[in-house]
């Protein structure tokens, strides 16, 4: 039986199934966000497409005349960069604990806001609130990624070579 004070410190080693399940969940959150970004590229209902004008819509996408396509590309790059940073950080972990999993859930919440931020920028690109929301979304992702790295270092979840003396403390 785990004591109440030890609930957040239960460690799951890298070789265990819990570590693999958590990693798969973290990666799938980014995949869902990227998929939802792509779904929102054309924000018109399917019944609005006419065979005689479809090529113009497609040409608009390819020439980046559709603000949703531009928002998709920019947001895709940002989500991809955050996923890569998270992936590289997790590659150096020897274990995870419940506090790290909880912090990752908060991080995934902000990752899955990517389609909302992209739609806000695509549909209201001149609105300062939309721009502010997009900036706040990026700041929240950055802060959460820093929190994850800090938490992993604080809980000694990194491999010994990463936890050892470094030039940054």
Which ranges hold each PLM region?
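Multi-pass alpha-helical transmembrane bundle typical of ion/small-solute transporters
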Residues: 1-169
